């Protein structure tokens, strides 16, 4: 009896295999397209579980966060901030913007002054960031940033964007980053935010600077792979579309409530 059941199973499997081979032989292109489409759908489900598609912004957005924002630089060119601030879709609006101010020794973003002024005038919380160059003195970079950015009450703390280490060792990079952070904190009275990609963070920065707020870039994940990092902001996409901005733009979420965001801006420490 068991032998007959086993034989039937083998026969059924063989017939299914022959049927599949026949379909592939008769409809090769359609079969390939079917399996490719299925694979894409499975991959999307894994990567975007917990996301919801938002048509106007042209991306999927993490569903469990309520505070959304963008970051911009000269690559977005001339921005219509009034249109940015007015945009709404599916209950989502943009509430903050991080704006590139400076880079390295002497580069000032040509659109910074305009973006800095108009983002605030149109009701967005604003933050300014410096792109760190490992080949330039940390103090020189900090002075450039502080000379360029005129902070006001209600602005985010300064941001240091750390994405490369050049010829430096990880230890030497951290030393220079620390110099920049301390110099800017002393001048502004607030601990700067550190921005970095998840992979670069794991390789060079993990376990250090835990007293600073973090902004991590990690795309197409349910949550950023933080390796114990207490992140405040998450850059989850670089392909968003926003009214008033030409081309793609980075999208971010704040990890917290509206009240926590306000406390963060005001510099109020959370109680345990």
Curated annotation (Swiss-Prot):
Official protein name in the record: Uncharacterized protein YegX
Homology family: Belongs to the glycosyl hydrolase 25 family.
Pfam families: Glyco_hydro_25
CDD domains from the UniProt entry: GH25_YegX-like
GO biological process: carbohydrate catabolic process; cell wall macromolecule catabolic process; peptidoglycan catabolic process
Record keywords, A-Z: Glycosidase, Hydrolase
One Gene Ontology molecular-function label: lysozyme activity
Active site: 71, 163
Gene3D superfamilies: Glycosidases
């Amino acid at each position: 009896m068991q032998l007959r059941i086993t034989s039937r199973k083998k026969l059924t499997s063989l017939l299914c295999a022959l049927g599949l081979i026949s379909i592939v032989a008769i409809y090769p292109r359609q079969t390939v397209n079917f399996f490719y489409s299925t694979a894409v759908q499975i991959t999307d489900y894994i990567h975007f579980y917990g996301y919801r598609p938002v048509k106007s912004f042209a991306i999927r957005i993490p569903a469990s966060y309520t505070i959304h924002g963008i970051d911009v630089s000269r690559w977005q060119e001339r921005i219509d901030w009034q249109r940015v601030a007015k945009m709404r879709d599916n209950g989502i609006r943009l509430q903050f913007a991080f704006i590139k101010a400076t880079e390295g020794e002497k580069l000032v973003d040509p659109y910074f002054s305009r973006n800095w002024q108009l983002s605030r005038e149109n009701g967005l919380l604003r933050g300014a960031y410096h792109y760190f160059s490992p080949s330039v003195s940390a103090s020189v970079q900090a002075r450039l940033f502080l000379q360029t950015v005129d902070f006001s009450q209600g602005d985010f703390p300064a941001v240091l964007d750390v994405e490369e280490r050049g010829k430096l060792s990880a230890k030497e990079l951290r030393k220079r980053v620390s110099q920049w952070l301390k110099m800017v904190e002393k001048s502004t009275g607030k601990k700067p935010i550190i921005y970095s990609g998840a992979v670069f963070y794991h390789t060079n920065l993990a376990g250090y600077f835990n007293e600073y707020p973090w902004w991590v870039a990690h795309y197409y994940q349910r949550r950023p792979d933080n390796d114990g990092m207490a992140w405040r902001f998450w850059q989850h996409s670089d392909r968003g579309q926003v009214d008033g901005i030409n081309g793609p733009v980075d999208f971010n979420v704040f990890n917290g409530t509206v009240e926590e965001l306000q406390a963060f801006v005001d510099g109020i420490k959370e109680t345990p």
